[in-house]
Amino acid sequence: MGYDLPPLREPDLPRTAKVRPVALRTGWTTGACATAAAKAALTALVTGVAPAEVEIGLPAGRRVRFPVARCDRRDEGAEAVVVKDAGDDPDVTHGAELTATVGWRPVPGLALEGGPGVGTVTKPGLGLAVGGPAINDTPRRMIGEAVAEVVDLTAVGVRVVISVPRGEIMARKTTNRRLGIVGGISILGTTGIVRPFSTASWRASVVQAVQVAAAQGERTVVLCTGGRTERGARALLPELPEVCFVEVGDFTGAAVTAAVTHGLSGVAFVGMAGKLAKLAAGVLMTHYTRSKVDLSLLGAVTAEAGGTADLATAVTAANTGRHAYELWEAAGLLGPAGDLLCSRVRAVLRRFAGDAVAVDVAMVDFTGARVVASSGRWAR
């Protein structure tokens, strides 16, 4: 190997990327809204009075109040609606009407069910029963605690059905189908609070996607940086099922760690020049606030691939990783330089994984339609 191995780094996001200089408004998770709706409906059932707002507890201990959009008695039960406010987060469930229908049951305790618009779990790996509603553990616990604030569950039985009008349509814009959740959205949330543009939630979704692939018996995951790279990856590996393809964004390191943790045997990474350059420099969390494209590395790759001194200088002075790619392409050096770049990325990922998994790397063009370079199983 004719170059110094870079140190491996998986930096955290800086505080300024988590808390924006101009404060963005937080919102409420589907789980928190479902909890508020359940408490409102049960309050109406018990007291005969429809509350205009209800207070619930969040997992961290904070108490918050939610306006109730609609609440009424129905036959032997009651129904309430809380409209989700996702704050400034671009959430497909913003404005969703989290609806709780409650009634009595003959045995003490709480029975929690999913109604129309709430997804059904069809595959293992989510920590939820296959065949049951996609209501995660924290919302389940929150709903149970809220119900227990209204009635004594050791003495009476309560049935709560959570539904979401248009939930099945909303779910089309989520990864639910890939994870094996069909028919609607998931009732989610670990804190009750939606933090705008939450990188933490994206990282968690990446880890969960790898976990689901492993739970379904898959041995390889294909890490893609976005929709275009995923299209290229699917063309490259058409034999793999959809669950194997994971959109990692900036969280390659987290995905590789999850693959090792869950005993997978192979990781393939498919990306474009900029992300590959960051990974080749040993940076496993590639958010723009924590890493820049190392153009000197690309200049060194240019020289190693047989490029002229003038080309290496031009690549080192390029504006972006894409600009460097275009310079390689114009000089007829895209294949050799791209292969070397992929080889460096493969070496980094193998070191990061501790040689626990086989690693393959491919670079696609900026449409995602064409693989232009590779290392590993596709090495030319």
Swiss-Prot record:
Signal peptide start-end: none
Keywords associated with the record: Cobalamin biosynthesis, Methyltransferase, S-adenosyl-L-methionine, Transferase
A single MF term (Gene Ontology): cobalt-precorrin-5B C1-methyltransferase activity
Pathway: Cofactor biosynthesis; adenosylcobalamin biosynthesis; cob(II)yrinate a,c-diamide from sirohydrochlorin (anaerobic route): step 6/10
EC number: 2.1.1.195
Gene Ontology BP, a term: methylation
Catalytic activity: Co-precorrin-5B + S-adenosyl-L-methionine = Co-precorrin-6A + S-adenosyl-L-homocysteine
Top-level class of the enzyme under EC nomenclature: transferase
S-adenosyl-L-methionine among keywords: yes
Pfam families for the chain: CbiD
Domain of life, source organism: Bacteria
Protein family membership: Belongs to the CbiD family.
Name by which UniProt lists this protein: Cobalt-precorrin-5B C(1)-methyltransferase
Gene name, Swiss-Prot/TrEMBL: cbiD
